[in-house]
Amino acid sequence: MIMEQLMREKLLTVKKRDGRLYEGKRSFWLENGIDKEYGGYLVCFDSKGKLMKELAVLTPEDKMIVTQTRMIWGFSALLRNGLAKRYGWEEKCKEAAKQGVDFFIDKFWDKKNTGWAWVTDRKGNVLDNGKLVLRTDLLQSMRLAEYYMATGDERGIEYAEKTFDALKKYAADTFYGGYFENFKEDWTLESAGVLWRRPEIPGYPHAHHGSIYNSL
């Protein structure tokens, strides 16, 4: 309840600061962020609202787990805190979130090894299937849990729990405590793998890892 109230107050503060965000029938992201051709979301726009032509690393149409699930969470949060209904966006937000989840589960979930891909192209072809636990698997679990709480779609909690099960199986350091961070596609550690735990408290997990318990 406290987190919901803080979320509501924060969004209302944004509304007061920039009323344009909430004016009209739909927000910028409802109008422009939905990939109507392939599903998921397009998120790289310039200051004029046009899809960018190039990026330093990927292409503007490539889809990363972080931004795809952030969009799912955003639409879900608007539904759950009542702002979507207040501004007449409820059905649009439901559809925007659902189609994002459809694309995300179909294209990002690693059906062979479990876990999630890092990035796909616009059509959903996997470009990088490595596992980066803190920035991807854990955050997307919380975002899918938000989607479930907003819509009741059982897939949200199903895949959040599947992810958590994979993390317990592959990422948990059962000797020292904490979690390993950086994995290859098959869950073998990359050479730059990191153990996320507080050195001053042996075995204490990183805060992001612990927060998954609150969502599930």
Task: Name the predicted role of every residue range.
Residues 1-216:
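Glycan-recognition and catalytic cores of secretory/periplasmic carbohydrate-active enzymes
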